[in-house]
Amino acid sequence: MRVFRRFYQVQLPPISKFRLLPQYKLKCGLEIHTQLDTRNKLFSMSTNDPFHSANKPNSHTSFFDIALPGTQPILNHEAVLFATKLAIALNCQINLDSQFDRKHYFYGDQPLGYQITQHFSPFASRGHLPLHKDIDGIDEISKNIHITQLQIEQDTGKSLYRKSDHITLIDLNRSNVPLIEMVTEPDFQDLKQIRAFIKKYQNLVRHLKISTGDLETGAMRVDVNLSINDHARVELKNLPNTSSILNAIKHEYLRQVQIVEDGMADELLSQPETRGWTGSSTVKLRSKETTIDYRYMPDMELPRITLAADVVETLQKTMPPLPDKILNTLMSEPYKLSLKDAKILCLSSNGQDEIYNHEELQQFYLDTFHSYADRVKGNIEANKLSKLPTNWIIHELLGDLNKLELPLSEITKVLTPQIFADFLMLIHNNEISSASGKLLLFHVLKTLKETNCDTSTTIDFNSLIDEFDIRTINQIDHDELREICNEIIETLNNDKLINDIVTGKKKKSIKFLVGQGMKLSQGRIKAQDFERTFKEVLDVKW
């Protein structure tokens, strides 16, 4: 059998045909390493900026980072604060008396010869992160993913292999960067749960402002532990992004299923092993027989982390609402946003080169909504209150800001929520059409960019409306409007289109005619008036 095992090759179907089989139960857990976005490194005063300093290797290093003999670690308390926030958000039990330990191994990018971590007494444990069907898109109504533990530890340096010279270079800018390692229980049973958890955890650390959460830059790194039908656990590494994580799981699941069906489970799935992801398959890195003995021992140069219970309680009370709570608020009265729109207001970016952040956008939306709602109360149904603020902020304003590369924080110095509510009232009162409103808003934003959002700039929408002659014509002669509609139909000279509209075969095509009318009138005649007149001219019965 040993000879057979040596030459055995697993033949797999393409992962595009992946599906979970009921007779082979997936059991999966995650280990996520998150770089903390502190000002300084974990045990030194070096600047913590490994991503932006990548083109300047070894520029952010201290004597301790390079393991100069005689140097000692000094704990960065900001990292402890960040870890406490995450532990609270993950509903963990915080260890008020945790300690640091040394994990010994020798590698070029670990100059100390050991990593400072928390093996014997981790910072927090026994937490959970809830997933919900209506928010996170899982199949179950709700599911708790249990957190085994959180531990604070230091990151390693970075090894860079230069193929042309056959040498490995070491960059220690990342050495001693603070990490939190979060370990889950093996609660995941399908890919939807795994995808939802990773997205939710990533958004959480961004929301708490403790990490950029970027997978691509290594600020968040995910290892996967999985097995089928309670066979030995396989750990998957080298997973740079979400698609790699999911594809590696698919491939490994299919590999293990095929091994069981080939009768090779006792030979190949009886011992834990670590496998790497190549981009198309998993390859063996090491098995239990070759597992490193890390010789853990307490770090005697660092005192224990002793926290007072009242400090944790105070932090818990003063933390801002978490994303799920904000989502539920936005989807409830009086806002009644769709999940998609609410998520736009809640999903945090990585903070790099952003046009807006979720806090700024949320506040601008809420202030605009309430200013607008106070003016139209009693004149509009409650469930329609959010329609204009949502459409014009989330869809129009953000689109224009992206086109102009104009930060929201800059334009709000002049275009305040109250002034934006004035603009919405012009549309609500049919002073201008939506088409004219889009042109007017873009013009205002472009002007703000050209003046560098000078706070002395005043925005007078009514003057601009008169200047560009785009005020809606509310009283138009009916015969004149019929004449315009007839002229559009004759100019188009498209009998098939007209017939499809009249017969009801393509009812939505009437919107095309309306669009032509809006274009011809420069948006000054309401779309409803055009649609009603076109139906009258064509004698539409539907």
Swiss-Prot record:
One cellular component term from this protein's GO annotations in UniProt: glutamyl-tRNA(Gln) amidotransferase complex
Reaction it catalyzes: L-glutamyl-tRNA(Gln) + L-glutamine + ATP + H2O = L-glutaminyl-tRNA(Gln) + L-glutamate + ADP + phosphate + H(+)
InterPro entries given in the database record: Asn/Gln-tRNA_amidoTrfase_suB/E (IPR017959), Asn/Gln-tRNA_Trfase_suB/E_cat (IPR006075), Asn/Gln_amidotransferase (IPR018027), Asn/Gln_tRNA_amidoTrase-B-like (IPR003789), GatB (IPR004413), GatB_Yqey_C_2 (IPR023168), Gln-tRNA_amidoTrfase_suB_CS (IPR017958), Gln_synth/guanido_kin_cat_dom (IPR014746)
- An example molecular function term from Gene Ontology annotations: glutaminyl-tRNA synthase (glutamine-hydrolyzing) activity
Could you confirm whether the keyword Nucleotide-binding appears in this record?
A: yes
What are the EC numbers?
Answer: 6.3.5.-
| UniProt superkingdom | Eukaryota
Q: Name one Pfam family in it.
A: GatB_Yqey
Gene Ontology biological process terms in this record: glutaminyl-tRNAGln biosynthesis via transamidation; mitochondrial translation
Q: Which UniProt keywords apply?
A: ATP-binding, Ligase, Mitochondrion, Nucleotide-binding, Protein biosynthesis, Transit peptide
Q: Which PROSITE patterns match?
A: GATB
Q: Which SUPFAM superfamilies match?
A: GatB/YqeY motif, Glutamine synthetase/guanido kinase
Entry's NCBIfam families?
gatB, PRK05477.1-2
Q: How does it assemble?
A: Subunit of the heterotrimeric GatFAB amidotransferase (AdT) complex, composed of A, B and F subunits.
The record's section on HAMAP family has:
GatB
Record-stated family: Belongs to the GatB/GatE family. GatB subfamily.
The UniProt function text for this chain reads: Allows the formation of correctly charged Gln-tRNA(Gln) through the transamidation of misacylated Glu-tRNA(Gln) in the mitochondria. The reaction takes place in the presence of glutamine and ATP through an activated gamma-phospho-Glu-tRNA(Gln).
Q: Give the protein name, as stated in the record.
A: Glutamyl-tRNA(Gln) amidotransferase subunit B, mitochondrial
